[in-house]
């Protein structure tokens, strides 16, 4: 039985995508891998097809016109056939032992007739070229080894929040939430890690470093100068996150979740505001004012 669909969105990922895909293959009998070739102009399509030819029972390839990271996630979710779903960016990779732990837990649940709507694991900021690593844990928020609800969670630290890298969702939860990511837009992972949360009724935390988030490419969207260049996209995503969930409704059922989600919106607002201030132009000031006015009405 295959338990997790891994979707790997790829755009001109030839230099590093093998590291990512190879990290998913050790347990290929239990996973589905969907490689999304998002209109690449390098050797990405050929590499993807090579994997599909070598591992036809595990790897599927979708070739599509370029639509950006969000469209790749959308395509993967639309074609996912497993109970659980996770996005792995093509320059990142998973830890083998951690993946084994997760699969063993899923097998155990299957025998018991149980399931989790959302699985949370640690992730690692991996500064590969500098040989530095920093693990981001959630052991202060979630009790390990127990099926939890939002009413059971602890308090997130100021720099701690749920991100795409740390989450595995039950596929049906994602579909039920209606999460669809905008095309040709950066920072859409904020939507993916936010909108489905009110639909999650069972949470399971494994205190293991599953996801390695590669830091080091100059064109990464988290780079400060790149973020300033793409500030309109950051604002666009911030507005979507701020308006896609009725937090008053969430508060009635899960007050702790509502508190977390409110803080999440506040963090995104702060990021947008600070970078608009750093840009410092008259146009940036107008955008900052418009953003705050938008927030007041939503």
Where are these regions (language model features)?
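Short, well-formed alpha-helical segments that are part of the catalytic scaffolds
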Residues: 12-26
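Acidic helix N-cap motif at the loop->helix transition within catalytic regions
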Residues: 16-18, 42-51, 63, 93, ...
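A conserved acidic beta->alpha catalytic loop
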Residues: 23, 37-47, 67-68
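Donor-binding/catalytic cores of nucleotide-activated saccharide
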Residues: 69, 92-203, 211-228
